[in-house]
UniProtKB/Swiss-Prot annotation:
Disulfide bonds: C152-C302, C174-C193, C368-C404, C375-C397, C384-C401, C414-C450, C421-C443, C430-C447
Protein name as annotated: Zinc metalloproteinase nas-13
Enzyme active site: E202
Origin: domain of life: Eukaryota
Binding sites annotated in the UniProt record for Zn(2+): H201, H205, H211
Length: 450
């Protein structure tokens, strides 16, 4: 029979081990927490720097096709991660102007549908919370770089004149507003959200897109297992008419980064949404699919480009395709299950041409001058030449960056910023409304704009 002393020692050891386990879990959680963000740092609006972009390679990891994206499925938000005020399955018709009052004038056909408010000239001003760690900033920079390489969407640092902008902040989980709502609108990348694919997903909401499985034709492609859906959350799987969500001429995309994962809002861990097509999977968070890229460029009237699709590493999950996007009407109508990630022209979004800088200054928008008190400091730090901050510096610190030249000297630097400008000009793109602003910036010489 054990002595009272040994029994007490055993109980004490057990308690000590239990306390150790608790503190160990807390320490691990704290370490993980600080890897992504530190709430003890005062919240301030910052922008990404050259250092953040340079750290992409340092922190780069193999893109995971599927990740734990449970932070995207908040039952209190519309479709889990959409935070537009008052938006739900019952109010969405009014939200889109799809009511008898608005329908008389066909407003839903002109002002809304898939993105009811687009960002002007595809430029989305942004700020980022000071609470993010270097690792998180690099992952956000990596996602933004994907937009820069593959679309004409320009996430640019907020300037003093930008009233509407997104603020990327580590709030409660992952969420965004859809489209340009006005003012300072949050994009939350909190705990569980610092994955490139998840960041791309939330930013794509801000660009103006809803989820893929909300399409009117989704029942032809996926099956909803209602018996596995958490009670009271059935409306998170509603679908919406073409009056509200524009498919932009593309077929259903199983591989869209905007698609629900198989167990979204599951009450028992079993699939709530399953592909009808065999040998395909849904809910990937590695990055854009080809159709994601096409739809963004289609919606924002981006200039034509050639997209070469790379085969995914795991060919058992998806098939590979190669498409040439030749015009705004030539959509990649992929077959069921065919997805991929496109690589656009890497130079097409480069805003480091002298011509682009000069045009933005001499476009009649105001005097060529510094608009910030810290311009000289920023210029000395090299931000005038950085490809990541040159547009911001040109708009706000033109004088310190040496961009203020006499108007009569403008023609001396009139040039094309792209090698294919003459060919595009001969095709008539200089005078086409959807391309005119782009051609004015990149092909001023061929278009005789200077």
């Amino acid at each position: 029979m054990p002595s009272p002393t040994s029994s007490s020692a055993s109980v004490f050891s057990s308690h000590l081990f239990f306390v150790f386990c608790i503190f160990s879990q807390i320490a691990q959680s704290y370490a993980q927490f600080n890897r992504f963000f530190d709430p003890s740092i005062p919240e301030q609006e910052t922008v990404l720097t050259d250092y953040d972009y340079n750290m992409i390679g340092h922190f780069r990891e193999n893109d995971q096709w599927f990740v734990n994206d449970s932070a995207m499925y908040n039952p209190l938000r519309f479709e889990g991660d959409i935070a537009n005020s008052g938006l739900n399955s019952r109010s969405i018709n009014t939200f889109f102007g799809d009511s008898p009052l608005f329908g008389i004038f066909g407003v839903q056909r002109n002002a809304v549908r898939q993105t009811y408010l687009k960002w002007e000239q595809a430029r989305i001003p942004y700020t980022i919370s000071s609470q993010y760690s270097s690792y998180s900033r690099s992952k956000i920079a990596e996602a933004i770089e994907e937009y820069r390489k593959k679309t004409c969407i320009d996430f640019s640092p907020k300037s003093a004149g930008d009233l509407d902008y997104i603020h990327i902040v580590p709030d409660d989980g992952c969420y965004s507003l859809v489209g340009r709502i006005g003012g300072k609108q949050p994009v939350s990348l909190g705990d569980g959200c610092i994955q490139k694919g998840i960041i791309i997903h939330e930013l794509m909401h801000a660009v103006g897109f809803f989820h893929e499985q909300s399409r009117a034709d989704r029942d032809e492609y996926v099956k909803i297992n209602w018996s596995n859906v958490e009670a009271g959350l059935q409306d998170q799987f509603d679908k919406y008419s073409l009056n509200m969500i524009d498919h932009l001429g593309t077929k259903y995309d199983y591989g869209s980064v905007m698609h629900y994962a198989p167990t979204a809002f599951s009450k028992n861990g079993k699939p709530t949404i399953e592909p009808i097509e065999k040998n395909v999977e849904i809910g990937q968070r590695a990055g854009f699919s080809e159709n994601d890229i096409y739809k963004i460029n289609m919606l924002y009237n981006c200039p034509t480009f050639t997209a070469t699709t790379l085969a995914p590493e795991n060919t058992k999950r998806v098939k590979s395709i190669t498409k040439k996007v030749t015009s705004a009407t030539g959509s990649p109508l992929s077959k069921k299950g065919e997805i991929g990630s496109s690589i656009g022209d890497k130079g097409d979004r480069g805003d480091n041409s002298v011509l682009s800088s000069l045009i933005s200054i001499h476009s009649g928008l105001g005097k060529c001058e510094d608009r910030r008190k810290d311009c000289e400091f920023l210029a000395r730090a090299g931000h005038c030449e950085s490809r990541f901050s040159i547009r911001f510096m040109t708009e706000n610190c033109a004088n310190s960056c040496g961009k203020c030249i006499a108007e009569e000297k403008r023609k001396e630097v009139c040039e094309d910023a792209r090698t294919w400008c003459e060919r595009w000009a001969n095709s008539g793109m200089c005078n086409q409304t959807v391309f005119k602003d782009y051609m004015r910036q990149k092909c001023a010489k061929s278009c005789n704009f200077c």
